[in-house]
């Protein structure tokens, strides 16, 4: 039990420090991205976890120029979704039928193993 608590504590510390280490050189882009429903990246070693489900969707059009790849959520998720990975390493959840989602998916490469 103590080992699992220690391991969980270490993982949480790494997650917090990792998110603090991100450097932003474009304040305008960061401000725009801060208004999007973002999730912390949970893709590790090319595996998708149950946490890779969308709980909410972005309401505006996907800014494709700020994205580097995407993947569709698992059929085990309660809502269908497309998770876009930003160039800054964050995730944005989008409704598959949302504005610009299909166009953006055509322009970007899917996240691959």
UniProtKB/Swiss-Prot annotation:
Annotated signal sequence is 1-21
Q: Name one GO biological process term.
A: cell chemotaxis
Tissue distribution: Most abundant in heart, skeletal muscle and adrenal gland. Lower levels in placenta, liver, pancreas and bone marrow. CCL15(22-92), CCL15(25-92) and CCL15(29-92) are found in high levels in synovial fluids from rheumatoid patients.
Q: Which GO terms describe its molecular function?
A: CCR chemokine receptor binding; chemoattractant activity; chemokine activity; heparin binding; signaling receptor binding
Q: Output the Pfam families linked to this UniProt entry.
A: IL8
Disulfide bonds, which pairs?
53-77, 54-93, 64-104
Q: Which InterPro entries match?
A: Chemokine_b/g/d, Chemokine_CC_CS, Chemokine_IL8-like_dom, Interleukin_8-like_sf
Q: Which SUPFAM superfamilies match?
A: Interleukin 8-like chemokines
Location comes to: Secreted
What the entry lists under CDD domains is as follows: Chemokine_CC
Provide the Gene Ontology terms for cellular component.
extracellular space
Q: Per its UniProt record, what Gene3D superfamilies does this chain match? A: 2.40.50.40
PTM remark: The N-terminal is proteolytically cleaved by proteases associated with inflammatory responses. The processed forms CCL15(22-92), CCL15(25-92) and CCL15(29-92) exhibit increase in CCR1-mediated signaling and chemotaxis assays in vitro.
Q: Which UniProt keywords apply?
A: Chemotaxis, Cytokine, Disulfide bond, Heparin-binding, Secreted, Signal
The record describes its quaternary structure and partners as:
Monomer.
Q: Tell me the function of this protein.
A: Chemotactic factor that attracts T-cells and monocytes, but not neutrophils, eosinophils, or B-cells. Acts mainly via CC chemokine receptor CCR1. Also binds to CCR3. CCL15(22-92), CCL15(25-92) and CCL15(29-92) are more potent chemoattractants than the CCL15.
Q: What family, per the record?
A: Belongs to the intercrine beta (chemokine CC) family.
- Name of the protein described by the UniProt record: C-C motif chemokine 15
Organism of origin: Homo sapiens (Human)
UniProt lists the gene as: CCL15
């Amino acid at each position: 039990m103590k080992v699992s608590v220690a391991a969980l504590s270490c993982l949480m510390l790494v997650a917090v420090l990792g998110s603090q280490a991100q450097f932003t050189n474009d304040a305008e882009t960061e401000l725009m991205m801060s208004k999007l429903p973002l999730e912390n990246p949970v893709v590790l070693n090319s595996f998708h976890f149950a946490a890779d489900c969308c709980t909410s969707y972005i309401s505006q059009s996907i800014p494709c120029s700020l994205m580097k790849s995407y993947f569709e959520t698992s059929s085990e998720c309660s809502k269908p979704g497309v998770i876009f990975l930003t160039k800054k390493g964050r995730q944005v959840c989008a409704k598959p039928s949302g504005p610009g989602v299909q166009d953006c998916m055509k322009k970007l490469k899917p996240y691959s193993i």
